[in-house]
Amino acid sequence: MTQPLKALRTRAANLEDAVAIAEIYNQGIADRVATFETEPRTPAQIAEWFKAGHLIMIAEADGTGAVAFAAAFPHSSRPCYAGIGEFSVYVARAHRGHRAGRAVLSALVEAATGRGFHKLVSRVFPENAASRVLLNRLGFEEIGTHRRHGQLDGVWRDCVIVERLLEHGGAPDL
């Protein structure tokens, strides 16, 4: 079993974290295992997330700075979907498998519950086993699959849909 990082802590991200968040996100984009995005993001683009009021948490470890982030944003601008957040989680390559993803997603769930979110939803590539295991352990349910939902490098990809209701008790006991 992989050992957890020592001195891992989570906190709400701020604008000063935009560079680190962009670096982590760009690793995920390059690896092609967690997003349909193909173009690297700049810190200025990440800064727009803060200006839009997105909920962003980071995990820091052993004085290395941010090693993971989780972000939630409105699922839709339509009023009927108010309170539903769509989220993403990314972990720096060197820190994958060390529970940073678990820590930062747990912090996001807690913060989203505190902000009054009703539900969190996301999409995961079917072969992303690590994400699927993490999501299951944190109380997310796989509720279906979007078939050929988007193209990545010219190939139509499926996405597993996950969700977690937050209104009945918040974060699970870990």
Label every PLM stretch briefly.
Residues 8-21:
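A short beta-loop-alpha structural element at the N-terminal edge
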Residues 18, 22-48:
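Conserved GNAT-fold acetyl-CoA-binding loop/helix
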Residues 38-94, 105, 111, 165-167:
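Acetyl-CoA-dependent GNAT
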Residues 71-74, 79, 121-124, 136, ...:
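Conserved catalytic-core motifs of GNAT/GCN5-like acyltransferases
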Residues 96, 122-132:
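Conserved beta-strand-loop-alpha-helix junction that forms the acyl-donor binding cleft
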Residues 97-111, 132-137:
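Conserved acetyl-CoA-binding loop-helix of GNAT-fold acetyltransferases
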Residues 99, 128, 154:
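Conserved G/P- and acidic residue-centered "switch" motifs that form tight phosphate/ATP-binding loops
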Residues 112-124:
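Conserved GNAT acetyl-CoA-binding A-motif
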